Amino acid sequence: MKTITSTSSMDRTNLLITLILSALLVVLFFAIPDFYPRLILFSLFSVVYVVIYGYNPTSYSLTEDSLLLNSPYKKISISLNEISAAQYLGKSNAFSMIRTFGSSGIFGHWGYFYSPRIGKVKLYARRNNHWILIHTLHRGKYIIAPDDPSFFDELQSRLLIEKVE
């Protein structure tokens, strides 16, 4: 089986939130008259933006035996044997979830969240649609959001093949 990859791009909502927050930071930067507080603000938010961007997914890949969540800093590999179920959630809203650690809004959603409906979940999504909930045997639940909705169908077929073999 060949490797299937789907990009992970921001939808309009997350792009708008990122642009608005960035614009507010620029306004705040110029509103501070003193150099050192301005430098501290710039340094702090530069680090925050770089960290958040680095952990947000850029793509998802299905290899012969694993699902890969690719980000600039880290590649998370989940063995297909480890996945017990995958469920297509479609359009969802991370803002209805409780963020326990991570980021929501700037460059998408990344981190640990809690949902009364789903429970604890690790969210790696740059968009609010095409959400796929992945249940693993020992690593908890993940939500991913590939750009290509057919990625879910390919994941399901590989999970079925994996279980038959």
Language model regions located:
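A signal for specific C-terminal beta-sheet/loop modules enriched in small/flexible residues
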Residues: M1-D11, I76-I98, F151-E165
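N-terminal membrane-targeting/pre-transmembrane regions
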Residues: M1-P33, S103, T136-K141
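A membrane-cytosol interface segment of integral membrane proteins
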Residues: T3-I4, Y114-E165
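General structural signal for secondary-structure boundaries
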Residues: T7-T13, F35, V47, S61, ...
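Alpha-helical transmembrane segments
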Residues: A23-V27, F45-V50
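Short, aromatic-rich membrane-interface segments at the entry and exit
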Residues: D34-F42
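Conserved beta-hairpin
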Residues: S46-Q87
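Non-transmembrane, membrane-adjacent beta-strand/coil modules in membrane-associated proteins
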Residues: N70-H138
